[in-house]
Every structure is written in C-alpha cells, then in structure tokens.
Amino acid sequence: MAKDEDNSRVHLLDLPWEDVLVPHILSYLPLRHILSLQRVSKPFHSLVHIYLCNCRHFDSTQLGPQLPKTTFSELLKNNTVLQKLDLQSCSDWLTDKELLPIIGQNHHLTYINLNSCGQLTRQSLVAISLSCPHLQNICLGHCDWVDCLSMRSLADHCKCLEAIDLTACRQLKDDAISYLVQKSTRLKSLSLAVNANISDIAVEETAKSCRDLEHLDLTGCLRVKNDSIRTLAEYCNNLKSLKVKHCHNVTESSLGNLRKREVVLDVEPPLQRALVLLQDVVGFAPFINLQI
C-alpha cells in the first residue's frame, strides 16, 4: 500500500520542464535562488541549464557585485533569446571579451544597461548597434568610452530607440547628440547630464526632432541657456519632467511656462528657493503672506 501511494505522488520535476517549470515557476524566482538549485541534484542542474538557455531577462544585480566573470560567461553562453540585459553590477571587470559573444548571439535585445562599465570600448557599442535592431532602451551612463563614431553607429542602426542615458559621456558634443536625435525621433527619455560640452544647439535639435519627448535630464550642462528651454517648451508638448539643476544660465523666465504646464522640475521657484536658503541661514522660515 505504501509503495502504491509513493508511486502515485507527483514530484516537482515530474511537471513539464519547458512548458510549466521554466516559464511559470522559475521565471518568478530570484536568479541567485535558481542558481542554488543546481547543487540539489543532477536533474535540477539540468533544469537550471534549460532555464538559462531560455531566460528572457538577465539582471546581474540579483547576484550581487561578486559575480565572477567566468561564471557570467558560463551562465549565458547558450542563450540566444535574451530581451533584457542588465550588467551594471559587472562594471568592475566587464570587458569586450565577455560582452561581445553575448551580444553577437542575442538579436532580440530591447533593453541593455551598461551603467559605469568603464572597461568596455566603442567596439561593444558598435556590436550592439549591428546586432540589436530592436533595441529600445540603453543605459550608457558614466561610460567615458562612448564617442561620436559609436554613437552614430547606434543612431544609424537602432531605429526603435525610446530611452537613452548618456550621463557623463563627456566625449559627446553637440554634433553627436544632434545626429542621434535626428535619427531617433521616437525618443521619450534622454539624459545628457554632467556634460559641459552640451549647449543650446543639442537641446534645440532634440526639441525639434523628438516631439514625443517626456523626460530630459540636463543636470550640470553648464552651457545650456534659456533659449533652448523655451524651444523645448514650444515643441515638446508631452514633456513630463525636466532636470536643470546646476544649469546656472537657465532661469525662471524660461521655466515659468513649463511650471504652469505642471512639468516636474528639479529646481524650486525663486521665492521658495529664497525661503529655503533663508531657513538654512537663520534656522527657521519666516511667515510671509503671499496674498498681499
């Protein structure tokens, strides 16, 4: 009787692997927990292998900053169906050698995060542009190696771009950004923050080319002035947020219209800013009757 009951039990691994376990169970577990299953038994090791070959999203932050490069390469060497790839926690060691094979065999990527991956070269971005025609969102923040040539390649080949983060990509100048936005008219989110090379020229071209723009980050773009912000207000009716902190030449005369449209700004109106400064100095904010 006991033997019959044991034979009638359904074990986890008895369920269809590719139709049930991988898409409906493993896909909801943190990656580090999935990898730990490899140590349970040989069947579980095989199951995890199938998962890694078929997973659509790979987020290195789920494994922490200690992910060895050999482990990383082994995990993804047989995957050809990735759609989202987040490698920001690999920034200490990721080079073209590790990235290029993965990019070369995954042509369905729509999201790539290479934030602070400073050891890559332009070769990686060129490879992305040639291998990932469906790319929609790419983060290249603090990647000093991004230059005009690699940016032109991205603009020429990735026609579906909707969001790009170029924070602190200091090799880029107005001409590179202008070329990018002329080719990427679907852009909804763009960060050009912390780049002293960016001026009104790039911002005005962005406004005129990307009419559906919703989010623009110009933090620390010291050469940006009121004229380009007015152009932005004129052409980008869908704008939802604008960051201009530390843009000392951008004043309320250009921000006022955006504020009236309830665009989220990261700088306070002049009166509120003055009250905050006064509070910092004297330790309290005076009561002011604003209705007078």
UniProtKB/Swiss-Prot annotation:
> LRR repeat boundaries?
134-155, 160-181, 186-207, 212-233, 238-259
Gene Ontology BP, a term? G2/M transition of mitotic cell cycle
CDD domains membership: F-box_FBXL15 (cd22126)
The reply to whether Repeat figures as a keyword in the UniProt entry is: yes
Q: Which InterPro entries match?
A: F-box-like_dom_sf, F-box_dom, Leu-rich_rpt_Cys-con_subtyp, LRR_dom_sf
Q: Which UniProt keywords apply?
A: Cytoplasm, Leucine-rich repeat, Repeat, Ubl conjugation pathway
Pathway assignment: Protein modification; protein ubiquitination
SUPFAM superfamilies from the entry?
A: F-box domain, RNI-like
**May I have one GO cellular component term?**
SCF ubiquitin ligase complex
Tell where it localizes.
Cytoplasm
**Residue span, F-box domain:** 12-59
Is Cytoplasm among the key words of this record? Answer: yes
Instruction: Describe the protein's quaternary organization and the partners it interacts with.
Output: Part of the SCF (SKP1-CUL1-F-box) E3 ubiquitin-protein ligase complex SCF(FBXL15).
Family from the record:
Belongs to the FBXL15 family.
Q: What does this protein do?
A: Substrate recognition component of a SCF (SKP1-CUL1-F-box protein) E3 ubiquitin-protein ligase complex which mediates the ubiquitination and subsequent proteasomal degradation of target proteins. Acts as a positive regulator of the BMP signaling pathway. Required for dorsal/ventral pattern formation.
| Listed name of the protein | F-box/LRR-repeat protein 15
